[in-house]
């Protein structure tokens, strides 16, 4: 009689442990994904702060002064065509 009771108890404990393992397998990927996401956010934040990156300064553009003078070609053409 005691052997049957022990067998039933072992079987019940085995079923409980299997249910527990299945529930862990379902919840573990969620926790793992959340922890990996937090880790990546921390790494990105730390690397961004450590790089001390500055915005690039806009390049200084110089314009040739001859381009700023009104061209005389248009006025000459108007004079030629108007005559």
From Swiss-Prot:
The keyword Lyase does not apply. GO terms for biological process: killing of cells of another organism; viral release from host cell. It is a lipid-anchor. It is found in: Host cell outer membrane. Its main location: host cell. One of its GO terms (cellular component) is host cell plasma membrane. InterPro entries: O-spanin_T7likevirus (IPR020130). Keywords: Cytolysis, Host cell lysis by virus, Host cell outer membrane, Host membrane, Lipoprotein, Membrane, Signal, Viral release from host cell. It comes from the Viruses. Residues 1-50 form the signal peptide. Belongs to the T7likevirus o-spanin family. Homodimer. Interacts (via C-terminus) with the spanin inner membrane subunit (via C-terminus). Part of the spanin complex which spans the entire periplasmic space. The spanin complex is composed of spanin inner membrane subunit and spanin outer membrane subunit. Component of the spanin complex that disrupts the host outer membrane and participates in cell lysis during virus exit. The spanin complex conducts the final step in host lysis by disrupting the outer membrane after holin and endolysin action have permeabilized the inner membrane and degraded the host peptidoglycans. Host outer membrane disruption is possibly due to local fusion between the inner and outer membrane performed by the spanin complex. This is Spanin, outer lipoprotein subunit. It comes from Escherichia phage T7 (Bacteriophage T7). The lineage of its organism: Viruses, Duplodnaviria, Heunggongvirae, Uroviricota, Caudoviricetes.
């Amino acid at each position: 009689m005691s052997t049957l009771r022990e067998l039933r108890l072992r079987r019940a404990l085995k079923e409980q442990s299997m249910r527990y393992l299945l529930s862990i397998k379902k919840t573990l990927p969620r926790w793992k994904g959340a922890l990996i996401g937090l880790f990546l956010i921390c790494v990105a934040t730390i690397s961004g702060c450590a790089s001390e990156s500055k915005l690039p300064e806009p390049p200084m553009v110089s314009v040739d002064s001859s381009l700023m003078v009104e061209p005389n070609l248009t006025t000459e053409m108007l004079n030629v065509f108007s005559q």
